[in-house]
């Protein structure tokens, strides 16, 4: 389930391919939008679209690119240390659904955040496909702890595609937890260390 928002900096929820909820308790330092909202709000967001990952990586990234899929956009402003985690939830509600999301995370210089992502299906939607493209950008001396917690159906096919670029002195921790058997899972996250002291675990 979704944890009480009193213990979270913010929450964003997608059901199938549409955003159903977005809230933010730390607006002074954390920005939470849908990817499409961010693209419309800021001209510079286009510089982060398909920069960490090529849309030609495979057929799943290509489909995400061609459909201009929505997803979540999380930005932590320069020097800001978030007091609580941001939680995201991706739920597949309808059976035989293709959930296709494109997420962007930007950690500005010296910022810090923990993100907890929960992904699941309803009991009636197990025979579905989840594609989640996540591009993560850590500027110098930033810190991100990113945890995916998945609970899929036994017939669900899951194709997370994650790429991170990590600047000088920045630290990125990536955890993946699968709570129960899944039909098919294919994942190959890639991190690029782009400066002295950059680290990924």
Listing of model-derived features with the role each one plays in the protein:
Residues 1-18:
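Short, Gly/Pro- and small/polar-rich lid/capping loops
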Residues 15, 22-33, 40-201:
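Conserved beta-strand/loop scaffold segments within soluble protein domains that form the structured core
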């Amino acid at each position: 389930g979704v944890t009480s928002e009193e213990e979270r900096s913010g929450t964003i929820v997608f059901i199938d391919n549409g955003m159903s909820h977005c809230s933010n308790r730390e607006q002074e330092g954390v920005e939470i939008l849908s990817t499409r909202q961010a693209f419309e709000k800021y001209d510079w967001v286009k510089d982060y679209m398909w920069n960490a990952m090529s849309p030609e990586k495979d057929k799943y990234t290509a489909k995400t690119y061609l459909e201009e899929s929505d997803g979540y956009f999380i930005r932590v402003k320069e020097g800001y240390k978030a007091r609580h985690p941001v939680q995201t939830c991706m739920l597949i509600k309808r059976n035989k659904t293709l959930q296709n999301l494109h997420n962007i995370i930007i950690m500005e210089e010296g910022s810090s955040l923990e993100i907890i992502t929960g992904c699941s299906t309803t009991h009636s939607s197990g025979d579905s496909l989840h594609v989640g493209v996540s591009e993560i950008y850590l500027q110098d001396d930033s810190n991100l702890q990113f945890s995916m917690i998945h609970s899929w159906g036994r017939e669900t096919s899951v194709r997370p595609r994650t790429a991170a670029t990590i600047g000088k002195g920045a630290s990125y921790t990536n955890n993946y937890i699968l709570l129960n058997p899944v039909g098919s899972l294919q994942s190959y996250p890639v991190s690029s260390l782009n400066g002295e002291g950059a680290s990924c675990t």
